[in-house]
Design a protein with these regions (language model features):
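Hydrophobic ligand-binding cavity/cleft-lining segments
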Residues: 1-48, 102, 154
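Short Pro/Gly-enriched beta-strand edge/turn motifs at strand-loop
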Residues: 20-23, 49-53, 75-80
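Hydrophobic-ligand binding "helix-grip"
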Residues: 28-29, 36-43, 56-107, 111-113, ...
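A conserved amphipathic terminal alpha-helix motif
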Residues: 114-154
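A short glycine-/small-residue-rich loop at the edge of a beta-strand within enzyme catalytic domains
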Residues: 8, 57, 129
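Amphipathic alpha-helical protein-protein interaction surfaces
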Residues: 23-26, 62, 102, 123, ...
Length: 154
């Protein structure tokens, strides 16, 4: 089992960060290892959207597909994802964005375990690096979107 939690203050608003993480259809464009993503179902109830998504991940010769239930809560600025089917015993992630005067405080947590011991051992070797690369990719995507929108306003 592997888990990680981190908290960062970023110069982007909570709604800007939420928009980047909630835009799961774009993950193949910028999330390391995301080789494809397909929306299987989408439902909305007020400001809460629930998406069932199938993601293909690729790391070297390893390719796996898994299905998750993703909950987007716009009122609370929270994105939760829970594993439904695939190679994991469990996989849970949570992004929470708290407004701050000069941006937002971003809380990220991931907890997972593979069913297969070989996959578990391999993931343990690269887990910290992959988490850093993934969170860095979301921050870079926010910077890209924020800078583009800032220049368009000038």
């Amino acid at each position: 089992m592997s888990s990680h939690e981190e908290k960062r203050v970023l110069p982007f608003s909570a709604s800007e960060m939420f928009a980047v993480v909630a835009d799961i259809e774009k993950y193949p464009e910028f999330v390391p290892g995301c080789a494809g993503l397909r929306i299987l179902d989408r439902k909305s109830a007020g400001n809460v959207e629930t998406i069932i998504a199938e993601m293909m991940v690729s790391f070297g010769a390893l390719r796996e597909t898994y299905t998750s239930k993703v909950t987007l809560d716009r009122n609370k600025n929270i994105v939760d994802a829970h594993h439904i089917d695939g190679p994991f015993d469990h996989l849970d992630t949570r992004w929470c964005f708290v407004p701050r005067d000069s941006g937002s405080e971003v809380h990220f947590a991931i907890d997972f375990a593979f069913r297969n011991r070989l996959l578990a051992a391999a993931s343990n070797l690269v887990f910290d690096r992959m988490v850093r690369k993934t969170t860095g990719a979301f921050i870079a995507r926010a910077a890209q979107r924020h800078n583009a929108s800032h220049h368009a306003q000038q």
